[in-house]
UniProtKB/Swiss-Prot annotation:
The keyword Secreted does not apply. It comes from the Eukaryota. Pfam families: Actin. It comes from Solanum tuberosum. This is Actin-100.
């Protein structure tokens, strides 16, 4: 979260709400009934953590409201009734969800104006393009979204329920097989950190496995909070390999390369060349070293042999959805696009389908 026109978000925190497991254990602590974001994270030992966004789609509105409240009042320290708000949504977000978001913004937070934009479209804007295909992979879900002249093509959007959280799970499982125990929500965060710091994508998986067997070149060590040191080798690339081979964790889905290809093939034959030449990676789960080269190699193998293929992995892609939003909301041409409170009062939540597409 942050302000339009800024080049980076002011606040970045996990979408988590934590509630005390046992009430009133801590005497004189003035215990809150709920903690949000980093505070929930740091007190996770005594809390039960909930994720109100599942697979990119809001599933628990009470907790989501807490997160928004926390964003306005504690993180950005603004009064929401004084600022227009740009929200983002997952591709193919159900209609009822868009309406609910709109309703909460106008009725609970009293915003003067708001707009809902599709995440992948914002990432594409942030890369300086209006046509291309975005592979957006975050914590809960991945999507491939073909976009032509600024508009997402809904019939060709594909969703893959495989993303950062699954890779963390996979690494937890691999480490458990090796005799380490990571089970609680607190320990999962340690494994996530390990994944972010050490994992990478192999250009050739089989060959990398051979290398890992015969040498210690891929081994790296990681210090746990209690001082114990773990050494991980092949695990470093076995975990993100799941993005290309979901069958490794028993999923029947196509990998991210094949899903991207399938998405392009659902588009009109005349625009495919523009899509192949503008494949943009976005989201935290595309931050692994080596992912762009591997993606390029895999798509080249699937595409027609004469096709020029370009995979773009902007360094700021972890936040490119936010950056695209900052750009969009600052444009003078965008100012007529906002849904105003007056329009909402007149038409109700369904106005969002007429004004945001």
């Amino acid at each position: 979260a942050g302000f339009a026109g800024d080049d980076a978000p002011r606040a970045v925190f996990p979408s988590i709400v934590g509630r005390p497991r046992h009430t009133g254990v801590m005497v004189g602590m003035g215990q809150k009934d709920a903690y949000v974001g980093d505070e929930a994270q740091s007190k996770r030992g005594i809390l039960t953590l909930k994720y109100p966004i599942e697979h990119g789609i809001v599933s628990n509105w009470d907790d989501m409201e807490k997160i928004w409240h926390h964003t306005f009042y504690n993180e950005l320290r603004v009064s929401p009734d004084e600022h227009p708000v740009l929200l983002t949504e997952a591709p193919l977000n159900p209609k009822a969800n868009r309406e609910k978001m709109t309703q909460i913004m106008f009725e609970t937070f009293n915003v003067p104006a708001m707009y809902v934009a599709i995440q992948a479209v914002l990432s594409l804007y942030a890369s300086g393009r209006t046509t291309g295909i975005v592979l957006d992979s975050g914590d809960g879900v991945s999507h491939t979204v073909p976009i032509y002249e600024g508009y997402a093509l809904p019939h060709a959007i594909l969703r893959l329920d495989l993303a950062g959280r699954d890779l963390t799970d996979c690494l937890m499982k691999i480490l458990t097989e090796r005799g380490y125990s990571f089970t609680t929500s607190a320990e999962r965060e340690i494994v996530r950190d390990m994944k972010e710091k050490l994992a990478y994508v192999a250009l050739d998986y089989e060959q990398e496995l051979e290398t890992a067997k015969s040498s210690s070149a891929v081994e790296k060590s990681y210090e746990l909070p209690d001082g114990q040191v773990i050494t991980i080798g092949a695990e470093r690339f076995r975990c993100p390999e799941v993005l290309f081979q979901p069958s490794l964790v028993g999923m029947e889905a196509a990998g991210i390369h094949e899903t991207t290809y399938n998405s392009i093939m659902k588009c009109d034959v005349d625009i495919r060349k523009d899509l192949y030449g503008n494949i943009v990676l976005s989201g935290g789960t595309t931050m692994f070293p080596g992912i762009a080269d591997r993606m390029s190699k895999e798509i080249t193998a699937l595409a027609p042999s004469s096709m020029k293929i370009k995979v773009v992995a902007p360094p700021e892609r972890k936040y490119s959805v936010w950056i695209g939003g900052s750009i969009l909301a600052s444009l003078s041409t965008f100012q007529q696009m906002w849904i105003t409170k007056g329009e909402y009062d007149e038409s109700g939540p369904s106005i969002v389908h007429r004004k945001c597409f």
